[in-house]
Swiss-Prot record:
Changing K792E: Complete inactivation. The keyword Cell division does not apply. Residues 1090-1246 are annotated as: Disordered. Keywords: ATP-binding, Bromodomain, Cell cycle, Chromatin regulator, Helicase, Hydrolase, Nucleotide-binding, Nucleus, Phosphoprotein, Transcription, Transcription regulation. Residues 1219-1232 have a biased composition (Basic and acidic residues). A motif (DEGH box) lies at residues 597-600. The modification Phosphoserine is found at S38. Residues 307-383 form the HSA domain. It comes from Saccharomyces cerevisiae (strain ATCC 204508 / S288c). This is Nuclear protein STH1/NPS1. Residues 795-956 form the Helicase C-terminal domain. Pfam families: Bromodomain (PF00439), Helicase_C (PF00271), HSA (PF07529), SnAC (PF14619), SNF2-rel_dom (PF00176).
């Protein structure tokens, strides 16, 4: 019965949802049946109940719907069909059961007791509990009908295993040693253990019972309750189980309460129980019963003392009150006096404030008067009224401006005198008469009129100039050059590029040849890249002149030398290189005129070209042609002026001091700001200096129909990858590319030099670093990553298709060829046809490329050029868009690049786009370039050196530049979105519409591509941080900390700042040319040597004392005085000088010490000494070994007064030198250290020479080991250490670099004394090679092969 109830409960728990769902479905079908009516009768099949609970629910449902048979006819039919199926199954079951019962033997007896034992045993086994022995000793019950095989066990007796430990111990004679053990009085422990175990097991069983345990009674079925009613005994078993569980859990509490109760009753019984408390035995145990209370009796003496104490307190209180009253009166008096004093001070302060306000008002009035006067002076200066300006300046008494004006006037006067001197010198050479100038004429002389005193009007070009007709501005340029010629001066023709400086120079030569009858010879010096163009121009414009083109191979030049020697030519056209190479031939002529093209090459007055021309060549006139007369600073402009007019501009310092002040905003901590008046005054004086000797016209002035040139600065964002790399390089001067990456250190760090250059590379494109591309794009294929990782490429990805669609052609200028390689991949990916020209392009290829690009129907869209190689001598006006990918430090290089397209012949507006990365080093470079252009604008452009602009125009232009410098707006800081970019790029409204359309098409294509990849939105155009590989997203501070050295001590070391490198010019050049040493190492080496020299001079060594304390004899002091030596000691030594001198005589008996005196002349040898120390040599000069005092000749010392350093060394031989030149040597008891050192060296050297031939033989055999593939010597890579410049990280990663030459050197000088040390050094060399190079590389393989060879060699020679 219990089993059936449990089965019923489990069935209800497990299958109730299924039956409920089935009944719900039947109910829904019944409702649907009622709605359908008689139209159609669907059949419903109810699944058979799988438990009695489901059957009961089906009965409940059947009873419930019997009251409404019409509405539930279909459901009733389905339930009755189910009941029929159940009845049929029951009949089948009973039939099978009867068949089974009939098959059982009639004589079989059912043993209920045995079955119960079997069940109990199974339950015990289920709980992993041992079965008791009496369960195992069951009688053997066999069925008579069953047949068994009888086995004879007579031969084999089973082994009896006893579980009784005591019995087994007793049988073995192992009785317990504790014979006096007493049994517990509270029962059997085994019984207690079994009871506790059963209680815990029962608690576990009750806790594991399900929470939804319920009981179902058949009485409720008979009462026909609905399914929503709860059973009357639903929670009976659950409550009983909870009561039993809580009762069992109370057992511990009951035990503790019982223990407390027993303890409390037993311990408090004699206090709480009356008859025990009143017992005499209990009372006797209490001490209080036996003690009598003490009676306190007052004493008279104590009373008297108390009264005396009270009187004393009252007396003191009165005295204190009197004292307080006196102090309060004093305080009141002081407060009264203070208030009176404060009121007096307040009146004084008020009077002072009135006086100060009066003085401030007077100062303001005076300031207004000064400003009003300054404005009047400025107005007079602008109106060019010099007399009024000087009068106002004299009234103002402005000493600063007066001094400035006086100095500039003196400089202009000196220049005027120099101009006259040069003109007079030229006149004397030509035999003309020199007219003296009076003082009155000197004061009224105009500087420009002095220079161009002789004027000559030119209306037509020379007849032998037949190549074409000169334009008006070219005739004016010819007229200016002829005026210089007439006035015996030289000048600079600085017309903007494209205005025909070449033609004007040829016209000057033809004019002098035809009109002035000056038959030359003329020398024209040009760059090699433009000599072809000059040759063509001479052939076209002046074919009648006998022109020699001096260039080519030595044989070609040799064939022309005879013609040059005899002077059978009119013009010699050559290059800078041959001017220097063949100066012995070319400098023999007295040249009539020297013309130098691209004259900014002469900006360095100390260059070899300037030196050669100035010192070897003789010429009557000089002319410099340059489109950029001022590229960086004013001294470069002075260098050009000094070259053409050496007599006039002969002091660079004077020129820079007076005219560089308004532009030199750096160089001192306190910046000297000039007022607008001072700036105008200085610049006007500078214009006065330059105007006679410099002519510059701009294309926009002389060619009015030339289209405009519009330059726009486009700001580009940094991608996530660029930001990470930029911060790494900025903070650590290195990149973290992950451990194991080729080219990086063991920790994955790639150290780099020249931080600014590396930052520029990162701004251009991160893939310039191969290690970065290997991590981000391992396949190195062309994909969207090319523009997603770089902001500039992302911008070009949006811009270039628009230019292509609108028919514009693009010139793109770069500073780095690596970026050009990446751009080529990008253009190929975008299917844009391009051409490339850089420094490696040959001259003949350049001409072909220019012709192909400039062809009328050329299909080339883009021309990639390097700024330095493609910025000169190219005509590319068929393109109308120039993109400056990265800005050059020299802004004139970018201007030259822009003028490739903006030149005469251009028909479209030229749009210049300069790409600048936001918040990067490129902004600093651009700012610096703008400063250089600003100087050029103020000095050159504002001068309007075209000989026709008025003073008002010059002043207006100059004022506009100065105002724009102070009020420069930063409206181009933010990056441009698509709409703003289209506004910038579009040259018309139609292009704006076209560009907007292209942007929409691009966005639609990006959405389609994202959808094809399964993305909801397109990825950002620039790669983000979360898309980068893990290497670039982790915190790299720890990696860089590992590379750094450990800090020394707890005190932070101060960083030492050096303001020079300490190298001479020769040492600097040697360091630059040395491949085995970087410039930083050379500077560091030089500083260490200088520090050692300083310590040696000060005497601060480990075994030296910086005092003169122990001078042994008085004769030594007199010796120093007689030879006029002065000892140079530290401040501490000087402080104790008198004391130590007095003690010297008394200490003569102490051990002798060495005094080493080093004169200032020894400093010449410090470089050699430091070099020998750094190389590890132990060289000691013989003079130092043999003598302790080095003294120079007395006569020389008296003249030069050399500074001496006195060094006192302990435990050394003392050598004294008397006035007569004799030496006295005092030897210590022990052997001389010098002899010991010499003996030790001799012994070491002889021992090292013993192994050196053997090692040399080993090296020779190693060098004979050749590779099987290409037969290269395996030792070739190990001969010397790699270059520090090429492999700077090698010396950071490898702790002990080693090479064959180092091993041979160490063997030769005795560092290695045994073959074992040589073997270890070779092993170190091979380990370094295997550690630094990848496994499988040829260096790695060579190291393994050589290692095997040396191991075999050492085994043979060790035996």
């Amino acid at each position: 019965m219990l089993q059936e109830q449990s089965e019923l409960m489990s069935t209800v728990m497990n299958n109730t949802p299924t039956t409920v769902a089935a009944l719900a479905a039947v109910a829904a079908a019944s409702e649907t049946n009622g709605k359908l009516g008689s139209e159609e009768q669907p059949e419903i099949t109810i699944p058979k109940p799988r438990s009695s609970a489901q059957l009961e629910q089906l009965l409940y449902r059947y009873r419930a719907i019997q009251n409404h048979p019409k509405e539930n006819k279909l459901e009733i039919k389905a339930i009755e069909d189910t009941f029929r199926n159940i009845s049929r199954d029951q009949d089948i079951y009973e039939t099978k059961l009867d068949t089974l019962r009939k098959s059982i033997d009639k004589g079989f007896q059912y043993d209920e007791d045995l079955l119960n034992k079997h069940l109990v045993a199974l339950q015990l086994l289920e709980k992993d509990t041992d079965v008791p022995d009496y369960f195992l000793d069951l009688p053997d019950t066999k069925n008579d009908n069953t047949t068994a095989i009888e086995v004879d066990y007579s031969e084999k007796k089973p082994i009896k295993i006893s579980a009784d430990f005591n019995a087994k111990a007793k049988s073995l004679g192992l009785e317990s040693k504790f014979s006096n053990a007493t049994k517990t009085a509270l029962g059997d422990p085994d019984t207690e253990i079994r009871i506790s175990a059963r209680i815990s097991n029962r608690i576990n069983e009750l806790e594991r019972l399900p929470a939804n345990l319920g009981t179902y009674s058949l009485d409720d079925c008979l009462e026909f309750i609905t399914k929503d009613d709860l059973s009357s005994r639903m929670d009976t078993f659950k409550i009983k189980a909870l009561v039993e569980l809580k009762s069992l859990k109370l057992l511990t509490k009951q035990k503790s309460i019982r223990q407390k109760l027993i303890n409390n009753v037993a311990s408090q019984a004699h206090h709480n129980i009356p008859y025990l408390r009143d017992s005499p035995f209990t009372a006797a145990a209490q001490r209080s019963v036996q003690i009598r209370s003490k009676v306190i009796v007052p004493q008279t003496v104590r009373l008297a003392e108390e009264l005396e104490r009270q009187q004393l307190l009252e007396k003191r209180k009165k005295e204190r009150n009197l004292h307080l009253q006196k102090i309060n009166s004093i305080i009141d008096f002081i407060k009264e006096r203070q208030s009176e004093q404060w009121s007096r001070q307040e009146r004084c302060f008020q009077f002072g404030r009135l006086g100060a306000s009066l003085h401030n008002q007077m100062e303001k009035d005076e300031q207004k008067r000064i400003e009003r006067t300054a404005k009047q002076r400025l107005a007079a200066l602008k109106s060019n009224d010099e007399e009024a300006y000087l009068k106002l300046l004299d009234q103002t008494k402005d000493t600063r401006i007066t001094q400035l004006l006086r100095q500039t006037n003196s400089f202009l006067d000196s220049l005027s005198e120099a101009v006259r001197a040069q003109q007079n010198e030229a006149k004397i050479l030509h035999g003309e008469e020199v007219q003296p100038i009076t003082d009155e004429e000197r004061e009224k002389t105009d500087y420009y009129e002095v220079a161009h005193r002789i004027k000559e009007k030119i209306d037509k070009q020379p007849s032998i100039l037949v190549g074409g007709t000169l334009k008006e501005y070219q005739l004016r340029g010819l007229e200016w050059m002829v005026s210089l010629y007439n006035n015996h001066l030289n000048g600079i023709l600085a017309d903007e590029m494209g205005l025909g400086k070449t033609i004007q120079s040829i016209s000057l030569i033809t004019y002098l040849y035809e009109v002035k009858k000056d038959i030359g010879p003329f020398l024209v010096i040009v760059p090699l890249s433009t000599i072809t163009n000059w040759t063509l121009e001479f052939e076209k414009w002046a074919p009648s002149l006998n022109t020699i083109i001096y260039k080519g191979t030595p044989n070609q030049r040799h064939s022309l030398q005879h013609q040059i020697r005899v002077g059978n030519f009119d013009v010699l056209l050559t290059t800078y290189e041959y001017i220097i190479k063949d100066k012995s031939l070319l400098s023999k002529h007295d040249w009539a005129h020297m013309i130098i093209d691209e004259g900014h090459r002469m900006k360095n007055a100390q260059s070899k070209l300037s030196f050669t021309i100035s010192h070897y060549y003789r010429t009557r006139n000089r002319l410099i042609l340059t489109g950029t007369p001022l590229q960086n600073n004013l001294p470069e402009l002075w260098a050009l002026l000094n070259f053409v007019l050496p007599k006039i501009f002969n002091s660079a310092k004077t020129f820079e001091d007076w005219f560089n002040t308004p532009f030199a905003n750096t160089g001192t901590q306190e910046k000297l700001e000039l007022t607008e008046e001072e700036t105008l005054l200085i610049i006007r004086r500078l214009h006065k200096v330059l105007r006679p000797f410099l002519l510059r016209r701009l294309k926009k002035e002389v060619e009015k129909d030339l289209p405009d040139k519009v330059e726009k600065v486009i700001k580009c964002k940094l991608s996530g990858l660029q930001q990470q790399l930029y911060q790494q390089m900025l903070k650590h001067n290195a990149l973290f590319v992950g451990a194991g990456t080729e080219g990086a250190t063991k920790g994955g760090i790639k150290g780099l030099n020249n931080k600014i250059m590396q930052l520029r590379k990162i701004c251009n494109h991160p893939f310039v670093f191969d290690e970065v591309e290997g991590v981000v794009n391992p396949s190195r294929g062309n994909s969207d990553l090319l523009f997603r990782v770089a902001g500039k490429f992302e911008l070009l990805d949006r811009v270039l298709p628009k230019f292509k669609a609108s028919g514009h052609r693009v010139l793109m200028f770069f500073q780095m060829t690596q970026v050009m390689d990446i751009m080529e991949d990008f253009l190929r990916m975008k299917d844009l046809k391009y051409m490339r020209l850089d420094g490696s392009t040959k001259t003949e290829e350049r001409t072909e490329m220019l012709n192909a690009f400039n062809a009328p129907d050329s299909d080339y869209f883009c021309f990639l050029l390097s700024t330095r190689a493609g910025g000169l001598g190219l005509n590319l006006q068929t393109a109308d868009t120039v993109i400056i990918f990265d800005t050059d430090w020299n802004p004139h290089q970018d201007l030259q690049a822009q003028d490739r397209a903006h030149r005469i012949g251009q028909k479209n507006e030229v749009r210049i786009l300069r790409l600048i990365t936001t918040d990067s080093v490129e902004e600093v470079i651009l700012e610096r370039a703008m400063q250089k252009l600003d100087i050029d604008g103020k000095v050159i452009q504002a001068g309007k050196f075209d000989n026709k602009s008025t003073a008002e125009e010059q002043e207006a232009f100059l004022r506009r530049l100065i105002e724009s410098e102070t009020n420069r707006d930063d409206d181009d800081k933010a990056e441009l979105d698509d709409d703003e970019l289209n506004d910038t790029l579009a040259r018309s409204a139609d292009e704006k519409i076209l560009f907007d359309k292209i942007d929409k098409e691009r966005m639609n294509q990006e959405r389609a591509d994202a959808k094809a990849q399964g993305l909801r939105v397109p990825p950002p155009r620039l790669i983000q941080l979360d898309e980068l590989p893990k290497v670039f997203r982790e915190d790299i501070e720890e990696h860089f900390k590992k590379e750094d050295s450990e800090p020394l001590g707890r005190i932070r070391q101060k960083k030492r700042v050096y303001y020079d490198d300490g190298l001479t010019e020769e040492q600097f050049l040697e360091a630059v040319e040395d491949d085995n040493m970087s410039l930083e190492d050379a500077i560091k080496k030089r500083r260490e040597a200088r520090e050692r020299r300083r310590l040696r001079q000060n005497g601060t060594k480990e075994n030296e004392i910086e005092t003169l304390e122990n001078t042994p004899e008085a004769s030594e002091t007199s010796l120093i005085e007689n030879n006029s030596f002065t000892a140079a000691v530290d401040e501490e030594t000087n402080a104790d000088k008198e004391t130590t001198a007095s003690r010297s005589k008394r200490r003569s008996s102490r051990k002798k010490r060495t005094i080493s005196i080093v004169t200032a002349e020894d400093k010449e040898n410090t470089q050699e000494e430091s070099t020998s120390q750094e190389n590890g040599g132990a060289k000691v000069e013989e003079e130092v070994k043999s003598s302790s005092v080095e003294i120079i000749n007395g006569s020389e010392s008296k003249k030069k007064k050399p500074k001496l350093t006195v060094k006192i060394k302990l435990n050394k031989t003392t050598v004294l030198e008397n006035n007569d030149g004799k030496r006295a040597e005092e030897k210590p008891e022990s052997k001389s250290p010098a002899k010991k050192t010499a003996a030790k060296k001799t012994k070491t050297k002889s021992k090292s020479l013993g192994i050196f031939p053997t090692v040399e033989k080993l090296v020779e055999e190693m060098r004979e080991q050749l590779d099987e593939v290409d037969s290269h010597p395996r030792t070739s890579i190990f001969e010397k250490l790699p270059s520090k410049r090429d492999y700077p990280d090698y010396f950071k990663v490898i702790e002990k670099p080693m090479a064959i030459d180092i091993i041979l050197k160490n063997c030769k000088n005795g560092t290695y004394k045994t073959l074992e040390e040589v073997r270890q050094a070779l092993q170190t060399m091979f380990e370094n090679a295997r550690f630094y190079n990848e496994e499988g590389s040829w260096v790695y393989v060579d190291a393994d092969k050589l290692n095997e060879f040396t191991d075999e060699w050492f085994k043979e020679h060790s035996s």
